[in-house]
Amino acid sequence: NQNEHKVTFKIKNIYASEYPEMVLKNIPVEFKLGNGFQIIGNTGSFDLCGQKITLKYGRNVLTYSIEAEIAPIAVQNNLETFIFNKGVNLSYWMTEADRNWLGMVTLKQFPMWKELGFDHFRVPVDELCIFDKDHNFNKMAEEKLHEFFTWCEDNDMRAILDMHTLGPRKGSDKYVEQELYDPKYPEMRNNFVDLWTKLTEEFKCHSHSHIAFELLNEPHDYTEDASNWQGLQKEVLTAIRSIDPDRVVFVPSMGWQDPKYIKYAEFLDGDPNIVITFHYYLPMLLSHYKMLAWKDYQGKVQYPGIVMPDAADAAAYPKYAEFHRTTFNADRIMGDMRMASADGANMNRMVHCGEFGCSKNVDDTQRLAWFNDMVKAMNANGIPWTIWEALDGGFSFISMDWDDGTYSIDTDLLEILTGKSLSAGQASEILTKYGYKVK
């Protein structure tokens, strides 16, 4: 008689989630057989990719199919009280040092975001907006941050203080990130550590359940394994932990916070209060359509489907065609979010999408489809998120008409983000309530 059996192995830890089949082929399985059993074949070593082992026992031939079940890894719950899921970036409040944005966000307006269904803020800050050249606090910025953090504590909202942009070194008029890692410029490294030492000392008085830190926005040291950044990151974390050991700290993935670099993230041994944070704007030609570095492209874009659908556009803009003559859809986004979540789980860490967005230059139907697929994928994989630009920007869902200074809410997008359904009239009432002019 020949009987078919199945042997299933549970794997509790697997690395390189992008290519699980490659990993499984490199895990040897060796069998110890009881008396009377004999392997039919020339090998006694197998892998976990569906191979079959045939045994002989007396007159019986037994065939076993070898399969692997990758068990989910429970993320260690070190963030029991820092509870966050859906958030907004206060994108220009304390960034862009050449402009004075400090009056743009006021205490009166903070409750609006909670009413719209959000539970946290990411607060990008530029060094030159909150410090002077001697690293003394800008008093107005310091006071506003304390005021804001206190409001979050009193209203059960969370805030992530993000060091968004560093200032240039002395003698230079431009910040160059590579100088952070260059031994010729030790002052850059020392400056970065000093900034976080001062920030930690200043804001350690605020609740660990409500206020968190994010080390740096979109680092990109250009090493394959992010080794330059990892060394500096540990130095900064050591400085923070010497002052505030229990603060939740968001550690950015390398490569402009590419989710593919999550698996390289490093932190101090035994530090439970770490979240790995990434950004997601793929495909870039769609998300940044007619904006910033992609503004020269004037052809068509498409979502879902082939991002650059026209062959004529591909011929006219070959530098974009290489990455955008491909199909992008809900399955691709779901796969990327699944990978990000799995890579975090492999390190027993929560992951967070700190920025995502799509240009308002994109057709509304396509833009909403992209947002819908993004939010569904992040929610399905347990990834908390913070949309880029809450208010009046190229990505925002609250827009200002520059002709008359009136504001409006994209109610379709808001419903995708938070599930809150508003009529146009209700949206106008909320804006008016918080001091925004409406038509």
Task: Give the location of each predicted region.
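Short, polar loop/linker segments at the starts of domains and inter-domain junctions
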Residues: E4-F9, E96-K108, M291-D296
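Aromatic-rich peripheral "rim/lid" segments of glycoside hydrolase catalytic domains that contact
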Residues: V362-K439
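Active-site mouth of glycoside hydrolases
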Residues: L79-V248, S253-K263, I416-E429, Y434
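Beta-rich interaction/scaffold domains
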Residues: N1-P72
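Active-site region of glycoside hydrolase catalytic domains
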Residues: P186, N190-F323, T327, R338-S359, ...
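Alpha-helical scaffold elements lining the catalytic groove of polysaccharide deacetylases
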Residues: R332-I333
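Short, hinge-like loop/turn segments at secondary-structure boundaries
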Residues: M140, E177-L180, E266-G270, A293-K295, ...
